[in-house]
């Protein structure tokens, strides 16, 4: 289990287009990060749905998915690529998230789900969430 001080907040964002059901987009976001509190911003052509949480268990689902889907190496690479100062930003496929899985292919006609992890300890968080592996086995 992750300690409370490993991150300050997790924010999850997605565009919601008129052809989409906002409740399904919320479900996709909650499948990755449970406990989100939502706000929606109407931009005319689309809405921006933003969910935020400070719950210490917020990243547990991603932790489990990265291991269950055996994608620790890819997850680690994406976390490192998205690491900027005190934020780690990853983008995942919205429709894949709806069925409860993670796919880092953000190329989707409906746009990705963006996960922003705000942390003062990014290295420690990345090591916990997606440790380096050798032959698929965590080594750190």
Swiss-Prot record:
Q: Which domain of life is it from?
A: Archaea
Entries under InterPro entries matching the protein: PAB1135-like, Ribosomal_uL5_dom_sf
Q: Which Pfam families match?
A: RNA_binding
Q: Which family would the database say this protein is a member of?
A: Belongs to the UPF0201 family.
Q: What is this protein called?
A: UPF0201 protein PF1297
